[in-house]
Amino acid sequence: MAHKKGVGSSKNGRESHSKRLGVKIFGGEACKAGNIIIRQRGTEFHPGENIGMGKDHTLFALVDGTVKFKVGREDRRYVSIIPAEATEA
């Protein structure tokens, strides 16, 4: 039996980098058009009013305003933006 392992065998180095997923701007916080609200895999949250969805299911603001989370039918979670003009009045 060899007392040392052969050169080149490595058990480490397979850990993938974290993808920094999750909510970036929370309910009640102000945001600007284009701000990323949520990064996600699949539609854990669905786009509501004034929210766009990227091809990787990222939700982003289409207008300036305040973020609002709500639960719809069958526990489907939605994110919406209440426009800044509506919140000022």
From Swiss-Prot:
GO terms for molecular function: structural constituent of ribosome. NCBIfam families: L27. Keywords: Ribonucleoprotein, Ribosomal protein. PROSITE patterns: RIBOSOMAL_L27 (PS00831). GO terms for cellular component: cytosolic large ribosomal subunit. This is Large ribosomal subunit protein bL27. It comes from the Bacteria. Belongs to the bacterial ribosomal protein bL27 family. PANTHER family: LARGE RIBOSOMAL SUBUNIT PROTEIN BL27M (PTHR15893:SF0), RIBOSOMAL PROTEIN L27 (PTHR15893). Pfam families: Ribosomal_L27 (PF01016). GO terms for biological process: translation. Signal peptide: none annotated.
